[in-house]
């Protein structure tokens, strides 16, 4: 059945900002969808609020709107563009919920827009817990005993009927948000309360606990002729109770019997038919009892999901691409398999290798968060590895996580019986470190029965881990490392570093082991991912390494450039770096064979047809060097680009160069000039530029000396980190003493992992009340091109990755911009940059200070590119390959005159706002972790607001980042520190003029009353122990108060917005309780005066709801006209 001819234009909704449970996989799926639609001659209208995505590049759609995914905005775009159809199944839960809201508001009917990919009814049946339960029953399958609740009273009745433990699952949420396992009434009330709040339909499913059962997933696709294929079965190594996104998962399934698998297939096919997904894909999760084989259907996603991306990368079967074609009316037998180019999509993929996915967590960013893994997803990223067997695949996946001590290690003394007993107790509770603890217990003598009893991980997987330990012990104890033994170690997934440690050689021994391995002729070979277990030839070069006999690499003629990706998403190194890598691949592919190396299954860069060759491999020195050596034999290699993937590839630069690998762009020595504090100080000195007073320290005594010389407050951080990890503002000796030991230990441990010499602790003068600026620029050795000058909305002290910023800057003078331009030129020249550089500055009392410089792609490059209409990373790639800025102006990649530092009257304003994951992280007693922003980055993603002026653009950024955006009326609670009280009267007057009622604590109300400003007084909250947010709460009744504290009012829904600035010492007493309650209630809250002032401007601007909606294609045309007029 050929495609439908009545659909001429399609609107695609993206997934918005990267959040836990919904990450880069939807950029991958959305990009595939846009490419398919355009290939089919269909006009594409794309809406997504996330600028750091490939799908929002202007060439991906005919009209691209970087706008909030909110019903009023979507209606404006629909009214303007008049699409024939809406495709919501490739943008995660955000797009599904947006489509449902448009349907319920009558917008789709009003503008005659058809929903394709899944109907509203199918979405409802798949997402609504009660309706889905009926579908499962009708399919002849079994659900866990369960009931629906919409209130805590109903929840209690269900608990009486079923008993504990109980699983809470909200309707219409993603990543298990608001879900959890309750073992008693207190936990049930806490989890169910959150679940009801986060569900847009105020609905939760309460079901019997099935913890410890085995968990499986099926990815299915169905066309309108009722053809169904099972793309990939996935097995969770962790049993039911840990969210699949937080579990180690494998494909194919290892512990299912053939009969069980066939039964899962039959149930899955019956469910996809029953739900009504007839032009797309879905993901279904099952639980299987380990002894009886009883099967329970857990849930489904009637859309492309995170697991779909994993299944696509694991098999080479492009689920999102095929789902888009199905939505257009094609059938599975009409769609060709791109990889074989000879089989149809109705052929189910077969794999002859093992795929393992390992999650990456960020608990270190959220002190106090409960590290227990539950049904609510907490991981921020994931890595995937392919190999010939499970042991090798697991070892590769664990080292792909790129986190200290995430691979198995046998350092130190063998655990004692007492320690083994402690470890067995610890692994009862699933945490990020469970597998490392489990291996240590095995090393110490724990039996398989003991480990199974503690974890309920299937014995098949445990046996494999026991075998890895057995091999490690053989390596450790052998007199000599024979070729046979070294190969056995490799087949067990052990890296050269792990073997070196087992042999007592430490990190330095990695080179010794590699040289020995090469002497033995023991090198990995590279196999092809072909979807058909080598039944047909693969046309696409998508490779993984393993220790087998024959390589499948093919010779090539063109010179190649190898680009190192950024690995798993994490806080501080996210999708922005994949964006720059993809741009480099796209641009350099015109003249070179591009070779991509990455291990993140969520990303566009790991799409099989994005580069000329794709290596799905860990980003470690060993793995990258082997790829380079293998590619050298296949054809000429110009070099490796390490500048685009963030800190991970950058940390390999020096060792790769020392091993004879040519590094393109900025050299490792030049990178060191910017990152080594002493060397960078010399660069600034020559350029006659100011830096905050600073010192370095390798001991507490040195740190004290430096802090006293500089003067408090100081900013303390380890060297060579990304995302401000370990960074803190310190106000006195006591705080410094507490910080130093931990920070020093982290810095030294990191240097061991990255192969660097021990690096010092950096101590800077903290610039209070300064304006912070980010500058992204290109430099070719002679000419500078400013990509963008971004002014932070918050004052200095908030990490640039968490700060809101505006481009063009809103308060900088022409003279200040000139000084920024001259300073950036001097730094780029002094550091011998070739390619991208990011410099962070601060203006304090009109004195310009340089905070730091990074000679690499920064996380603001995508934002600056979208705001200025210039693909900076594409130009950077060509400069790294030896071309000049003048060449890029000539070929049209850069503006013929001027650059992104020029401000044109009438230019649209872009505001970047960060999205923070605080609602995901709770303390052991259920409170959210504190949201105070500081110098350590904690955001997972970003959005962009785009409009005619700063107030409108800022309002859009808030609407995109937070459900509902900013209120235009209602009640505002204000509590500010003593320093901020002098700015309070003007703010309060503005609030009154805008029609808000003010609520305040006694001290703040007293200040306001002196200026004749009325406010309602609320009781103050304080905790007995200032630093302990879990301490019991005492309430102090203030004179004239309403008899309630602000937390009571927030919980009663009587507060609409909060300004709560902490005192300078970061006291967490009152502020913590207020901020935690506000997170639970999803209220807009501000912890800096400057951002609250911006919010007031925004509220004033949007009271009339007159947003300007402009596509980025229209924006680029407008910019070009303004530039032409000016020059």
From Swiss-Prot:
Positions with a binding annotation for Mn(2+) 1: 285, 299
Alphabetized GO MF terms: ATP binding; carbamoyl-phosphate synthase (ammonia) activity; carbamoyl-phosphate synthase (glutamine-hydrolyzing) activity; metal ion binding
One of the Pfam families matching this protein, by short name: CPSase_L_D3
Classification via InterPro entries: ATP-grasp (IPR011761), ATP_grasp_subdomain_1 (IPR013815), CarbamoylP_synth_lsu (IPR006275), CarbamoylP_synth_lsu_oligo (IPR005480), CarbamoylP_synth_lsu_oligo_sf (IPR036897), CbamoylP_synth_lsu-like_ATP-bd (IPR005479), CbamoylP_synth_lsu_CPSase_dom (IPR005483), MGS-like_dom (IPR011607)
Chain positions covered by the region annotation Carbamoyl phosphate synthetic domain: 552-962
Positions contributing to Mn(2+) 4 binding: 852, 854
Region (Allosteric domain), start-end ranges: 963-1127
Recorded GO CC terms: cytoplasm
This protein's record includes keyword Magnesium: yes
Residues that hold Mg(2+) 2 according to the record: 299, 301
Record note on cofactor: Binds 4 Mg(2+) or Mn(2+) ions per subunit.
SMART domains: CPSase_L_D3 (SM01096), MGS (SM00851)
Family: Belongs to the CarB family.
Protein name, UniProt field: Carbamoyl phosphate synthase large chain
Gene that encodes it: carB
């Amino acid at each position: 059945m050929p495609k439908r001819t009545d659909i001429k234009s399609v609107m695609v909704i993206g997934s918005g900002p990267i959040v836990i449970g919904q990450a880069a996989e939807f950029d991958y799926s959305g990009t595939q969808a846009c490419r398919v639609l355009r290939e089919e001659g269909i006009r594409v209208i794309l809406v997504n609020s996330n600028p750091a995505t490939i799908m929002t590049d202007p060439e991906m759609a005919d009209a691209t709107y970087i706008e909030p995914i909110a019903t009023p905005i979507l209606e404006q775009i629909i009214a303007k563009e008049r699409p024939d159809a809406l495709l919501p199944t490739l943008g995660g839960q955000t797009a599904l919920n947006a489509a449902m809201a448009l349907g319920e508001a009558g917008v789709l009917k009003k503008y005659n827009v058809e929903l394709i990919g899944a109907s509203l009814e199918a979405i409802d049946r798949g997402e609504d817990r009660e309706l889905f339960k009926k579908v499962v029953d009708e399919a002849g399958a079994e659900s866990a005993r369960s009931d629906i609740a919409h209130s805590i009273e109903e929840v209690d009745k269900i608990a009486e009927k079923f008993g504990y433990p109980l699983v809470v699952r909200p309707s219409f949420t993603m990543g298990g948000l608001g879900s959890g396992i309750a073992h008693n009434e207190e936990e049930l009330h806490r989890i169910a309360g959150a679940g009801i709040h986060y569900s847009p339909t105020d609905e939760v499913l309460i079901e019997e606990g099935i913890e410890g059962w085995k968990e499986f997933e099926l990815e299915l696709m169905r066309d309108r002729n009722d053809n169904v294929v099972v793309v990939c079965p996935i097995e969770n190594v962790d049993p039911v109770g840990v969210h699949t996104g937080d579990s180690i998962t494998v494909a194919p399934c290892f512990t299912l019997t053939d009969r069980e698998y066939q039964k899962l297939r039959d149930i899955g096919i019956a469910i996809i038919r029953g739900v009504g997904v007839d032009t797309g894909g879905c993901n279904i999760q099952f639980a299987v009892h380990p002894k009886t084989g009883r099967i329970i259907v857990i849930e489904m996603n009637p859309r492309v999901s995170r697991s779909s991306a994993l299944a696509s990368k694991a098999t080479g079967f492009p689920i999102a691409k095929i789902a888009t074609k199905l939505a257009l009316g094609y059938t599975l037998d009409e769609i060709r398999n791109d990889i074989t180019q000879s089989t149809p999509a109705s052929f189910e993929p077969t794999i002859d290798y093992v795929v393992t996915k390992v999650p990456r967590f960020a608990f270190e960013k959220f002190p106090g968060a409960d590290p227990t893994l539950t049904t609510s997803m907490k991981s921020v990223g994931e890595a995937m590895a392919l190999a010939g067997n499970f042991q090798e695949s697991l070892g590769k996946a664990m080292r792909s996580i790129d986190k200290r001590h995430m691979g198995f290690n046998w350092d130190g003394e063998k655990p004692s019986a007492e320690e083994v007993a402690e470890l067995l107790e610890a692994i009862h509770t699933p945490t990020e470190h469970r597998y490392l603890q489990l291996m240590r217990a095995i090393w110490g003598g724990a039996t398989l029965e003991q480990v199974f009893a503690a974890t309920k991980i299937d014995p098949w997987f445990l046996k494999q881990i026991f075998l890895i330990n057995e091999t490690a012990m053989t390596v450790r104890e052998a007199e000599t490392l024979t070729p046979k033994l070294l190969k056995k170690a490799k087949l067990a997934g052990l890296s050269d570093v792990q073997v070196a440690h087992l042999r007592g050689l430490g990190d330095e021994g990695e080179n010794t082991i590699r040289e020995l391995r090469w002497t033995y002729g023991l090198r990995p070979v590279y196999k092809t991912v072909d979807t058909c277990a080598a039944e047909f030839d693969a046309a696409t070069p998508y490779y993984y390494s393993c220790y087998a006999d024959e390589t499948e690499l093919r010779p090539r003629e063109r010179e190649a450039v190898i680009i190192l990706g950024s690995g798993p998403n994490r806080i501080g190194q996210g999708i922005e770096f994949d964006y720059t890598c993809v741009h480099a691949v796209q641009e350099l592919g015109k003249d070179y064979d591009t070779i991509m190396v990455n291990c993140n299954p969520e990303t566009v860069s790991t799409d099989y047809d994005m580069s000329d060759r794709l290596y799905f491999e860990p980003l470690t020195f060993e793995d990258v060097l082997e790829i380079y050596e293998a590619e050298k034999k296949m054809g000429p290699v110009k070099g490796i680009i390490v500048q685009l993937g963030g800190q991970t590839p950058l940390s390999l630069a020096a060792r790769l160069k020392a091993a004879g690998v040519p590094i393109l762009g900025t050299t490792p020595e030049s990178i060191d000039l910017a990152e080594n504090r002493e060397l960078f100080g010399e660069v600034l000195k020559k350029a006659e530029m100011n830096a905050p007073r600073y010192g370095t320290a390798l001991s507490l005594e040195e740190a004290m000396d430096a802090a006293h010389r500089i003067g408090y407050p100081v900013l303390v951080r380890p060297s060579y980190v990304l995302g401000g990890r370990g960074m803190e503002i310190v106000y006195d000796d006591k705080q410094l003493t507490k910080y130093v030991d931990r920070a020093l230990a982290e810095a030294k441990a990191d240097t061991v992992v990255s192969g660097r010499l021990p690096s010092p602790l950096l101590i800077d003068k903290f610039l209070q009340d300064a304006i912070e600026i980010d500058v992204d620029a290109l430099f070719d050795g002679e000419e500078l091109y400013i990509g963008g000058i971004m002014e932070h909305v918050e004052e200095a002290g908030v990490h640039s990755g968490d700060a809101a910023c505006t481009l063009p800057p809103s308060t900088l003078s022409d003279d200040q911009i000139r000084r920024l331009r001259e300073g950036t030129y001097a730094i780029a020249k002094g550091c011998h940059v070739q390619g991208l550089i990011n410099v962070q500055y601060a203006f304090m009392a009109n004195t310009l200070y340089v905070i730091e410089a990074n000679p690499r792609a920064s996380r603001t490059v995508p934002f600056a590119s979208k705001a200025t209409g210039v693909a900076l990373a594409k130009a950077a790639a060509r400069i790294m390959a030896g071309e000049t800025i003048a060449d890029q102006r000539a070929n049209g990649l850069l503006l013929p005159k001027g650059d992104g530092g020029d401000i044109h009257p009438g230019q649209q304003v872009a505001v970047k706002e960060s999205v923070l994951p605080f609602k995901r992280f709770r303390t052991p007693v259920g409170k959210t972790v504190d949201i105070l922003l500081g110098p350590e980055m904690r955001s997972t993603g970003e959005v962009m607001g785009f409009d005619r002026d700063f107030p409108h653009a800022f309002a859009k950024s808030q609407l995109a980042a937070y459900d509902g955006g900013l209120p235009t009326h209602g009640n505002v609670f204000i509590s500010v520190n003593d320093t901020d009280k002098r700015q309070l009267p003007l703010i309060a007057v503005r609030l009154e003029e805008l029609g808000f009622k003010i609520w305040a604590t006694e001290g703040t109300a007293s200040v306001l009353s002196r200026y004749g400003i009325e406010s309602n007084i609320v009781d103050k909250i304080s905790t007995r122990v200032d630093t302990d947010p879990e301490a019991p709460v005492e309430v102090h009744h203030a004179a004239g108060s309403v008899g309630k504290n602000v937390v009571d009012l927030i919980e009663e829904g009587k507060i609409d917005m909060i300004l709560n600035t902490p005192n300078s010492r970061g006291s967490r007493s009152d502020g913590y309780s207020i901020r935690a309650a506000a997170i639970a209630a999803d209220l807009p809250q501000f912890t800096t005066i400057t951002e609250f002032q911006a919010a007031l401007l925004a509220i004033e601007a949007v009271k009339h709801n007159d947003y300007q909606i402009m596509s980025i294609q229209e924006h680029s045309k407008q910019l070009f006209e303004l530039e032409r007029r000016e020059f």
